[in-house]
Structure formats: C-alpha cells, structure tokens
UniProtKB/Swiss-Prot annotation:
InterPro entries: L-lactate/malate_DH, Lactate/malate_DH_C, Lactate/malate_DH_N, Lactate_DH/Glyco_Ohase_4_C, Malate_DH_type3, NAD(P)-bd_dom_sf
SUPFAM superfamilies in the record: LDH C-terminal domain-like, NAD(P)-binding Rossmann-fold domains
Annotated gene: mdh
Name used for this protein in its record: Malate dehydrogenase
GO biological process, one term: tricarboxylic acid cycle
Binding sites annotated in the UniProt record for substrate: R84, R90, N122, R153
Active site: H177
Amino acid sequence: MIQSKKIALIGSGNIGGMIAYLIRLKNLGDVVLLDINDGMAKGKALDIAESSPIGKYNGEIFGTNNYADIENADAIIVTAGITRKPGMSRDDLISTNVNIIKEIATNIAKYAPNAFVIVVTNPLDVMVLAMYRYSHLPSNMIVGMAGVLDSARFSYFIAKELNVSVESVDSLVLGGHGDIMLPLIRYSSVSGVSIADLIKLGMITHDKVTEIVERTRKGGEEIVSLLKTGSAYYAPAESAVLMLDSYLNDKKLMLPCSAYLKGEYGVHDLFVGVPIIIGKNGVEKIVELQLTEEENSIFNNSVALIQNLVANI
C-alpha cells in the first residue's frame, strides 16, 4: 500500500482552511492543520473530516497547536500571519509577520527539514526570503505563491472582457507580488492567439489591456476593499494547491512563483516572481525569459522595491 503524503498547513484562517479542504477534495495526502488558536485548527479539521463520507475522499486530517505534529512532513504551506485591512498595504504587515515567519521557520528546520515549503503570507517576497534565511532549507525547496494567483486574475479579466472561456486564456505575471508586478502581454494569449494580435483584430483595445493590467496589480486590494474585514482566500488557496500538486505528483508544471535567484534576470540573493518548473525535487528549473527594454525596466523596479523591503529583516 502506498503511504499517503503528509502535508502540514501552518495557519488555519480562511486560506489555510480552504487549502485543507482542497487537498482533501483532490486526495493529495494527509493534512496537519496547525494554528496557535488550537480550537480553530481542530474545529476546521473536524468539520472537513466530517464531510469525507459525502465527498468520498480518503486520508487523515487533524488540527493542533503543537509543532511536533508536523514532523517529517513532505510539504508545508505557510499562511499564518495578520492579513490586510482596508487602506493597509502588504508592506504594512512586514514587522509583525517577519516575527511570525521566524518562529515557523525555526520549527520547520527542527521537525521537517526535508519538506518542500510554499509561503503564502504577505508581503510575500519578504516573507519567503525570511523563511529561507531562518529555516536554512535549500533554496530549491522554498517558493512563494504569487505569480500563479496574479496570472489567474489577469487571465480572468481578459476572459471576461473577450467573453471567452477562462480555459482559453494563458497569461504570465512576473516580478514582485504587489503594485509593480509585471504582466507580460507578449506571453499572454487566447487559444494561442497573442493579446497583441487580438488588439490588431479589434477584439480588445490597447487601453482596455492597460486597464486590465492595472486592475490585476490592484486585484488583492480590490477584494480587501469589498470584504472590509479580510482578504482573498479562494483564489490564493487554489494557487497554492496547484503548486503543491506539481511537487507531490512530480507534474513538472511551469508556473510563475517567487523563487530564489542566483544571477538569473541579473538578480542575486532575492526571491522574485519568475517562471519555474516544480517537480519532485522542488524548484527544478528557473526559466529565464528575454525581456524587452520596457519589460526589463518594470521588472527591475519591482526588484528594487523588494530589495528595499527586505533590507531590515
């Protein structure tokens, strides 16, 4: 009998709870849901477990506040941290969430040093670097969830504007997870037809694409302003689980994620959103695209912003 993979979710808030549910739906493995709020972790785990007879999914799930329970986890997704309130930027979260990540990273190093770690906590590009520095895990075993979500938002907005299925749209967003992300129009298409060609065909205007790019950059902020008391969690959870699935099942999907760069794109010792291939060995390849002068300028501005944010961690 094949042993189930052990997946630890650190943080049982909206995103953590949704990730746990999606993992069960997809039968990806057994789940440990950890939170300092013991009751929340145990309550959500029990609620999900009680849905198993209806959903016909197998595997164990339990909640805890004890880091020892993540021992020998195959993969870990970190969502713990305070979330944004209206008017608050991701950057406002830094001081509090770095301390949270530091504690988590120390315990991952102690109990699950061989795990593949996906960081979701914002501000993403700062938190994933903090995870790397404090856990001392290999750089190929730590990634941040950002580009998958940003690309999904961009694809959705394009699909709605063109009145086509979201399944027809492919897009790619690089750079930091914030206002200076870089949606790559040249690498975005609808059933193989580039956005540039769709503009030429009159199916969408350049101004509308520019508007969609800006809406994508403000995608998280838009949801925060609507919810008033929280931030997005359905799409972030789906994004993290897609990355997890690629690792656990060696799918080798090429996905835009925050990954550690060692000279690629001219960047050293930072986690930045770029296309990577995720397989059983973690980050198996960083795909280095040739950017235009304009794209490179935006990308470098994004990198500079990340450098400023991580200066004091």
